C-alpha cells in the first residue's frame, strides 16, 4: 500500500513518501534548505539547526526539517494538506540567529583557509546570515589533533556538525573519532590521540562543511577557482569510481569523488584521492634503448626502429598491464596478432575463463549488494581490494544482511560468519542444500586471490556451484582496472600467462609491472613509470598515465566508463594508442585507424556492448565444469593496499601510509 502524503511547501502542493523527512520533501519540491549537519548518506544528527522551517499549525517554534518526517505532520482542521513554509519571517529570523551562533567562535580566517571558495559556511553566511554580530567577548580556541598524514586539522574552525564522526563510525567502520564535552567545551577529538586507521578517511575532508578538516598533501597549493576540473574514472582498483581531477597548469593538484549511486556513491579510497603525487615522480619522459647493457636515451624514430627490427620474423607475446585502457589493449592485440603472436591480460595468473563472461565477471551489479540479505565472500578481503565496495557491504550488514567469509580471518569493519580458511570449506558449503538461502537476496563474491593459484579454475567452479545452488547473484571482484575490458577485447591466450610467454623471442610489455620476465626474450616496455617493467626492458617507450589520455575502462561489474584527459604526458611521452599506431606503421602493417575515435569505433564493432557507456550488460549464466580443488588455505590478492601499482609506488604519500599500516600490524595497541 502506498504511503504517499500530500504536503504544501511554499504554496506548492506536492505528493511525497510519508517516510521522507521535510528536508527531503523540500528538495523534491525544488526548494533549497540550508544545512550543515545533515547528509543524505549519514544518520540524522539534528544538531546544527540551520535547516529550520515553519510548520503551519504545528509547534509555535521552527522545526528541524532534517529530523521531522512528513507522516508526522498534522493535516488542517478540515483535512487540508499540511503547510510548510521555508522562507517566512520566522524562518529567516531563526536562520540569522543560528548563523550568528555559528560564527561566535569561528576564527573568520578565510584568506588563509584551504576551504575558502568552496566553503558551506561562507556561502550560507552570505545567503542567510546578518552583516554584523552582537558578540564582543573573547572567542574560544581549540587544540588541533593529529589524525595522520592525510587530514589536516584546524579545530578552532569546527562547528560540531559531527559529519566526520558519523562517517568514520557508520561508513568507514572505525571508532577513533568522537565528540567530548558540552556547549562551549564541546570538541571533536580522536581516541587516545590515535591517527585514523582507515583507507576511506579522506572522505571526511569532503564532508566537513568548514575548514576544520582539510587535505594535508594539497595544503596551500591552489585555490579552487584556479583549477581546471575534469570528470573522469579512477583506476586504482577495479570498482571504476567516478572522480574529478583538478589540475593547475600541467600538474594534477587533487582528486575528488563524483557522485554515482551505482558505483561509488560519493566516496573514494585514500589511494584514489592521494596518489596524484605519484603522477609526477619516476616518470618516463623519453624513449630509451639498451646499448652494451645500458639504457641510453633515444629518439622516437630510433626506439620504434629498434622495436620493429626485433619483432620482425620473431615469436612475439604481448602483455596487458593493470592500468591500460581498453582501446590500448585492443590496439596491442591487433598489432601482436597481426605479427602472428598472442596477447595475455591475466598477468597475475588468474584462472578466468576467457569465453565465459559470467565466469570472469559474474551476474551481480554493485547495487545488488544494497538489497542483499546474505553475502558470501570467497578468498577476498574487500577492505583491501576495494574499500568503497567494502563500505557498501558494511551498509548491507547494518541493514541486517548476514556476511560469510571463506578465507583467512580479517578485520572487515563488520561482523561475519567465518566458514573456514581453506578450499575444503568452500567445497563443503557448495555441496550443501541451503534451502532458506534460495528465498533470499544473496550474493556470492569471489576474489582474485582465490583464482590465481594452480587450482583457480576448480575454485571458480565451486564458487559458481554455490551461487547456482543458492540462486545467488555472482560477482568476481577484480583488482585490476584494465582486466575486464581487456578480456572483453579478447586479450587472452590458451594456457594463460605461461602459455603466452612460452617460447616467446620478444615480449611487448604494455604497462605490466607485476610480472617477472625471465632472461632471454627481447623485452619492450611501454608505460608511464620507471618501475619493475622498465628495469627489465631492452627498449622503453614512454606512455601516458590514466589522467593524461582518454580511454574506456570496464569495471568489476562490467560497466564501461569513459575516462577523460585531465593533463598532458611529460616530455616526449605519448598516448598509448598513438605509440602502437606508429609502431604498426614502422612494421609495415599499418592499422586501419589513425585517431582514437577510429580505434574506438573498431573496438565497438568487435565488442558492441562496450559502446553502451555506463550500462551494465546482462550476462548469460553458464557455470564452469565442476572440478575438485586442492586443500590449501585461500589467500588474498592484496598484501599492501597502498603499493599495488607503479603510480602508487612512486607516491611519497602512499609510501608513508604503507609504512604506517605496517607499523600498526607489527605493534598493535595493547588492550587495557
Q: Language-model segments: what does each one mean?
A:
Residues 51, 66:
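Acidic, glycine-enriched active-site microenvironments
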Residues 347-613, 665-672:
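Non-catalytic alpha/beta scaffold blocks inside enzyme catalytic domains
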Amino acid at each position: 500500500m502506498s504511503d504517499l502524503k500530500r504536503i504544501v511547501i511554499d504554496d506548492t502542493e506536492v505528493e511525497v513518501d510519508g517516510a521522507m523527512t521535510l528536508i527531503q520533501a523540500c528538495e523534491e519540491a525544488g526548494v533549497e534548505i540550508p544545512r550543515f549537519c545533515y547528509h543524505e548518506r549519514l544518520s540524522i544528527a539534528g544538531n546544527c539547526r540551520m535547516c529550520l522551517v515553519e510548520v503551519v499549525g504545528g509547534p509555535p517554534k521552527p522545526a528541524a526539517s532534517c529530523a521531522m518526517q512528513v507522516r508526522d505532520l498534522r493535516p488542517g482542521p478540515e483535512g487540508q494538506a499540511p503547510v510548510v513554509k521555508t522562507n517566512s519571517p520566522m524562518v529567516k529570523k531563526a536562520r540569522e540567529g543560528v548563523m550568528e551562533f555559528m560564527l561566535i567562535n569561528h576564527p573568520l580566517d578565510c584568506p588563509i583557509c584551504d576551504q575558502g571558495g568552496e566553503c558551506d559556511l561562507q556561502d550560507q553566511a552570505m545567503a542567510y546570515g546578518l552583516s554584523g554580530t552582537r558578540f564582543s567577548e573573547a572567542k574560544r580556541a581549540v587544540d588541533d589533533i593529529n589524525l595522520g598524514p592525510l587530514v589536516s586539522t584546524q579545530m578552532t574552525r569546527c562547528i560540531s556538525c559531527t559529519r566526520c564522526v558519523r562517517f568514520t563510525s557508520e561508513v568507514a567502520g572505525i571508532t577513533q573519532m568522537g565528540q567530548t564535552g558540552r556547549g562551549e567545551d564541546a570538541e571533536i577529538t580522536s581516541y587516545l590521540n590515535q591517527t585514523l586507521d582507515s583507507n576511506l578517511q579522506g572522505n571526511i575532508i569532503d564532508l566537513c562543511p568548514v575548514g576544520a578538516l582539510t587535505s594535508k598533501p594539497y595544503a596551500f597549493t591552489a585555490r579552487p577557482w584556479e583549477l581546471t576540473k575534469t570528470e573522469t574514472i579512477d583506476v586504482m582498483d577495479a570498482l571504476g569510481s567516478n572522480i574529478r581531477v583538478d589540475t593547475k597548469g600541467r600538474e594534477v593538484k587533487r582528486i575528488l569523488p563524483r557522485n554515482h549511486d551505482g558505483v561509488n556513491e560519493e566516496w573514494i579510497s585514500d589511494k584514489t584521492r592521494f596518489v596524484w603525487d605519484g603522477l609526477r615522480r619516476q616518470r618516463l619522459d623519453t624513449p630509451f634503448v639498451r646499448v652494451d647493457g645500458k639504457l641510453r636515451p633515444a629518439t622516437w624514430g630510433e626506439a620504434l626502429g629498434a622495436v620493429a627490427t626485433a619483432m620482425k620474423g620473431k615469436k612475439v607475446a604481448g602483455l596487458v598491464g593493470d592500468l591500460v585502457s581498453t582501446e590500448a589493449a585492443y590496439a596491442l592485440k591487433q598489432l601482436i596478432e597481426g605479427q602472428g603472436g598472442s596477447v595475455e591480460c591475466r598477468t597475475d595468473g588468474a584462472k578466468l575463463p576467457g569465453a565465459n563472461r559470467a565466469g570472469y565477471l559474474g551476474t551481480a551489479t554493485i547495487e545488488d549488494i544494497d538489497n542483499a540479505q546474505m553475502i558470501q565472500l570467497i578468498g577476498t578481503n574487500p577492505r583491501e581490494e576495494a574499500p568503497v565496495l567494502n563500505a557498501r557491504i558494511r551498509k548491507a550488514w547494518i541493514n541486517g544482511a548476514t556476511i560469510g567469509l571463506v578465507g583467512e580471518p580479517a578485520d572487515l569493519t563488520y561482523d561475519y560468519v567465518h566458514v573456514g580458511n581453506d578450499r575444503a570449506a568452500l567445497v563443503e558449503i557448495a555441496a550443501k542444500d541451503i534451502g532458506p538461502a534460495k528465498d533470499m537476496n544473496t550474493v556470492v563474491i569471489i576474489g582474485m586471490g582465490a583464482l590465481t593459484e594452480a587450482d583457480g579454475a576448480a575454485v571458480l567452479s565451486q564458487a559458481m556451484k554455490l551461487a547456482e545452488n543458492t540462486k545467488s547473484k555472482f560477482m568476481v571482484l577484480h583488482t585490476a582496472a584494465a582486466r575486464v575490458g581487456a578480456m572483453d577485447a579478447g586479450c587472452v591466450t590458451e594456457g594463460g600467462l605461461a602459455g603466452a610467454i612460452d617460447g616467446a623471442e620478444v615480449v611487448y610489455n604494455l604497462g605490466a609491472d607485476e610480472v617477472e620476465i625471465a632472461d632471454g626474450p627481447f623485452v619492450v616496455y611501454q608505460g608511464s613509470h620507471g618501475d619493475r617493467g622498465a628495469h627489465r626492458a631492452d627498449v622503453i617507450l614512454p606512455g601516458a598515465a590514466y589522467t593524461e589520455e582518454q580511454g574506456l575502462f570496464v569495471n568489476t561489474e562490467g560497466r564501461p566508463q569513459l575516462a577523460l584527459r585531465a593533463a598532458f604526458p611529460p616530455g616526449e611521452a605519448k598516448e598509448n594508442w598513438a605509440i602502437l599506431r606508429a609502431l604498426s606503421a614502422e612494421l609495415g602493417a599499418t592499422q586501419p585507424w589513425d585517431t582514437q575515435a577510429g580505434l574506438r569505433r573498431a573496438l565497438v564493432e568487435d565488442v558492441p556492448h562496450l559502446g553502451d557507456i555506463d550500462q551494465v550488460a546482462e550476462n548469460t549464466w553458464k557455470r564452469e565444469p565442476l572440478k575438485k580443488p586442492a586443500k590449501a588455505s585461500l589467500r588474498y590478492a592484496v598484501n599492501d593496499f597502498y603499493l599495488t601499482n607503479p603510480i602508487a609506488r612512486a607516491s611519497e604519500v602512499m609510501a608513508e601510509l604503507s609504512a604506517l599500516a605496517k607499523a600498526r600490524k607489527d605493534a598493535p595497541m595493547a588492550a587495557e
